[in-house]
Amino acid sequence: MSYAIIETGGKQLKVQPGRFYDIELLHVDPETSHTIDKVLLVSHDNEVTVGQPFVEGATVEGTILRHFRGRKVIVYKMRPKKKTRKKRGHRQEITRFMVNAINFNGQVIGATENGTTTPTTANVEVATTEGSDSEE
């Protein structure tokens, strides 16, 4: 199992190939590839490389799936015994980021199969019902 710890949007996040993550807004068009080079740690086959502060030559490649807004957070301020009340809401802009590969010194150490994100339907069985077969 290979993983990396990246920094994006002022936060640190543990990422693995083949998974998607909701991160702070990236000003990149959806359905395009994006590379993050702020990699703090890379782990592959029980071998851990820690950067100071970043790992040289390590990148995380992925695809921007979509942009959306998070859940609304209500901020309510009230001063007791006064008629002062403030109610405000905030919705954070979020980007859904699919990790395709983790690269380290020019080698791909973790990647998804073909970099695709669509599920396959090869193993799906369709159940059909036949006429009037009933248990006797």
UniProtKB/Swiss-Prot annotation:
- One Gene Ontology CC term in the entry: ribonucleoprotein complex
Which InterPro entries does its entry note? Answer: bL21-like, bL21-like_sf, Ribosomal_bL21, Ribosomal_bL21_CS
Disulphide bridges: none
Tell me where the signal peptide lies.
none
GO BP term (any one): translation
Keywords per UniProt: Ribonucleoprotein, Ribosomal protein, RNA-binding, rRNA-binding
Q: Which GO terms describe its molecular function?
A: rRNA binding; structural constituent of ribosome
Instruction: Return the Pfam families for the record.
Output: Ribosomal_L21p
Member of which family? Belongs to the bacterial ribosomal protein bL21 family.
Job of this protein = This protein binds to 23S rRNA in the presence of protein L20.
**What subunit structure does UniProt give?**
Part of the 50S ribosomal subunit. Contacts protein L20.
Classification via HAMAP family: Ribosomal_bL21 (MF_01363)
Q: This chain belongs to which protein, by name? A: Large ribosomal subunit protein bL21
- Biological classification of the source: Bacteria, Bacillati, Cyanobacteriota, Cyanophyceae, Oscillatoriophycideae
The gene coding this protein: rplU
